[in-house]
């Protein structure tokens, strides 16, 4: 089981969600603890990945040696979603 951490940015992003979006995103993030590279996860670069949760994207990093997943951002899909990924995590 991997330990989960959210950056302050990711926590703010999650706090802004509501209703079904919140439930689905939180469930997806919790699932990363059991399976950090679920089906459909896409490697962005380096240790950074993204998963799709409806219209939302969860950007995160996996550190296998430490069994750690750090969620850096939760955002609605747009051209800006993936900008500056390295600075997030």
Where are these regions (language model features)?
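Enriched for short, Lys/Arg-rich terminal
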Residues: 1-3, 12-16, 20-23, 53-56, ...
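Basic nucleic-acid-binding interfaces
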Residues: 5, 16, 40-43
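Hydrophobic, well-ordered secondary-structure scaffolds
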Residues: 5-6, 25-27
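Charged, well-structured alpha/beta interaction segments
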Residues: 7, 20-21, 33
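A short, surface-exposed loop/turn module that caps and links secondary-structure elements
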Residues: 27-52, 82
């Amino acid at each position: 089981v991997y330990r989960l951490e959210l950056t302050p940015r990711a926590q703010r992003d999650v706090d802004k969600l509501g209703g079904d979006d919140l439930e689905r995103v939180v469930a997806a993030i919790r699932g990363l603890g059991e399976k950090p590279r679920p089906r459909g996860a896409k490697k962005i670069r380096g240790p950074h990945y993204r998963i799709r949760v409806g219209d939302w994207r969860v950007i995160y990093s996996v550190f296998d040696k430490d069994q750690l997943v750090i969620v850096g951002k939760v955002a609605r899909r747009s051209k800006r979603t993936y900008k500056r990924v390295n600075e997030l995590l």
